[in-house]
Curated annotation (Swiss-Prot):
RNase H type-2 domain: residues covered: 15-193
Coarse class of the protein's main subcellular location: cytoplasm
Annotated positions binding a divalent metal cation: D21, E22, D112
Function: Endonuclease that specifically degrades the RNA of RNA-DNA hybrids.
Keyword annotations of the record: Cytoplasm, Endonuclease, Hydrolase, Manganese, Metal-binding, Nuclease
Protein name: Ribonuclease HII
Organism: Rickettsia prowazekii (strain Madrid E)
């Protein structure tokens, strides 16, 4: 059965709604990226869904359409700050910055996951990238943005195969760490590192 991705946007139809999602939370390397998107309910872009369910090519196409047609913002928290404040706090900070940087101020903020925020406008939705079009759009922006950053870092450190694993703890990545040690972009706070 196809899930209605506009159910939360319809529930809060009297409000300006932003969807927020992150990419890179479980990675061993690099930043965490959060994006916030306010969709235009009168101009729904077809094909938007959770970024993990889309091919790389489809994500790139939708990224261009979303960033050309909707209000959006992205925030990046570096690996060094993740090590200083922990990944959960870094993710929450990235989400809050992405929302604060939107050119239109949302009244309701739908966030993927179960994070708790002091700002009462934030509404956490477990599996939100599969339940809200706004969150799904944000998941695409966050993933494409972070993947592009990881491709740049991979050119500097090709031995870790970040162009394939994007910094996640694949067998090849763990073996590269054992062989070459940690790069300057690895998160020291992660047990795998």
């Amino acid at each position: 059965m196809e899930v209605n991705l506009l159910q939360y946007e319809k529930k809060y139809h009297n409000y300006i709604v932003a969807g927020v999602d992150e990419a890179g939370r479980g990675s061993l390397v690099g930043p965490v990226v959060a994006s916030a998107v306010i969709i235009d309910k009168a101009d729904i872009i077809p094909g938007i869904k959770d970024s993990k369910k889309l091919s790389k090519n489809k994500r790139e196409i939708l990224y261009e359409r979303i960033t050309s047609n909707y209000v959006w913002s992205t925030a990046i928290i570096a690996h060094t700050e993740i090590d200083n404040i922990n990944i959960l706090e870094a993710t929450k900070k990235a989400c809050a910055i992405a929302v604060a940087n939107l050119s239109l101020k949302p009244q309701k903020i739908l966030v993927d996951g179960n994070m708790k925020f002091s700002d009462i406008r934030f509404i956490s939705i477990i599996n939100g990238d599969n339940l809200s079009l706004s969150i799904a759009a944000a998941s695409i922006i966050a993933k494409v943005t972070r993947d592009r950053l990881m491709l740049e870092l991979s050119a500097e450190f090709p031995q870790y195969l970040w162009h394939k694993n994007y910094g996640y703890g694949t067998r090849e990545h763990i073996e590269a760490i054992k062989t070459h040690g940690l790069s300057s972009y690895h998160r020291r706070s992660f047990k795998s590192c």
